[in-house]
């Protein structure tokens, strides 16, 4: 079944079309949610909310641009809304609790870190830093757009991005030392 047929079926509230949309895109969209969530259950909650929005707003998809891109945008906006609703309940753990070595100021080898390492380190950022970092680096938004989406000043977006990068660099250096690789 084509995307257009699935869209038309979902607009008519056809359960089979809704299931096909879920089956075809839930894995991809869960990956998007994982970048903004602190753990998998939270990402799954975001995904559920995103699909509710998708189903309720599917009639607004104009057909211009990629359908997958529209789904991604709805999902990212859902993650932002989820972040705002749950901001006071967020906590993060810190790799510094597990690392006693002093940090050098060198870079790192990308191939040295597993996807799990990178995911864990990203999730150790505060929710605000992680949100700005992901919107800027992964989604490609400009700081002005991020500021408008999150209701913050442009300079706040820039400084949070800069601080997130510095924190990530330090945490990755610490992780390398923990693994016994001195750069």
Predicted regions: what they are:
Residues 25, 160-163, 167:
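Residues within the DNA-recognition helix of helix-turn-helix
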Residues 59-62, 73-93, 111:
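Arg/Lys-rich amphipathic alpha helix in sigma70-family domain 2
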Residues 132-136:
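A short pre-motif secondary-structure segment
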Residues 31, 45-52, 65-77:
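Structural recognition of an alpha-helix C-terminal capping motif at a helix-to-coil junction
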């Amino acid at each position: 079944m084509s995307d257009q047929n699935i869209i038309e079926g979902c607009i008519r509230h056809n359960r089979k079309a809704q299931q096909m949309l879920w089956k075809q895109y839930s894995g991809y969209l869960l990956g998007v949610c994982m970048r903004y969530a602190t753990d998998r259950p939270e990402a799954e909650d975001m995904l559920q909310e995103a699909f509710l929005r998708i189903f309720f707003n599917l009639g607004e998809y104009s057909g211009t641009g990629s359908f997958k891109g529209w789904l991604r945008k709805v999902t990212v906006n859902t993650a932002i809304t989820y972040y705002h609703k749950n901001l006071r309940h967020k906590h993060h753990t810190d790799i510094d609790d597990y690392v006693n070595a002093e940090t050098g100021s060198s870079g790192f080898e990308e191939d040295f870190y597993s996807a799990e390492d990178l995911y864990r380190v990203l999730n150790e950022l505060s929710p605000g830093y992680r949100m700005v970092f992901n919107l800027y680096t992964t989604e490609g938004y400009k700081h002005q757009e991020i500021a408008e989406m999150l209701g913050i000043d442009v300079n706040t977006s820039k400084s949070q991005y800069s601080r997130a990068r510095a924190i990530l660099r330090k945490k990755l250096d610490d992780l390398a030392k923990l693994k016994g690789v001195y750069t």
